[in-house]
Amino acid sequence: HHKMLVMQGCFRCGLYWQGLTHDLSKLSPVEFWAGAKYWQGTCSPNNAQRKAEGYSAAWLHHKGRNKHHLEYWIDYAPNGDHAMAGMRMPNRYVAEMVCDRIAASKNYKGTSYTDAAAWEYYEHSRDHYILHPETRKQLETCLLILRDEGEDECFRYIRTQLLGKKK
């Protein structure tokens, strides 16, 4: 269900290929079997694997193969001080990340989902996210538009402003 929701969101943004190929690494054995073993329906099976085993092999595999995850873009800062820093994400992956967050919120919240859910989830953890300042601004803008103006306006903004598509 999650993949279908992400695909629908990506299609609304004009990201057809990304919608079709979203999270295909979940079919790899390390991700698939962890998902099957730790599935709960109310939170990520990666969290359950992390709690049970001390780390999530599925998540470590997943984040390194999917460019719509902010963790994919963490590297050493270019200024040479060896600190970890968020690199700027290409806009199409920011858009896919928003679609992913909306879909996850719909799945986990079920009938209690509102357009504020993705922002509320982000806000709960935002202080520890390692994000490039421009990527943070783009993500927050999209999530606040979703919260305050709704899904149609959020997808319109992503399509026309973030991605620069005409329709």
Indicate residue ranges for each PLM-predicted region.
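Metal-dependent phosphohydrolase cores
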Residues: H1-K167
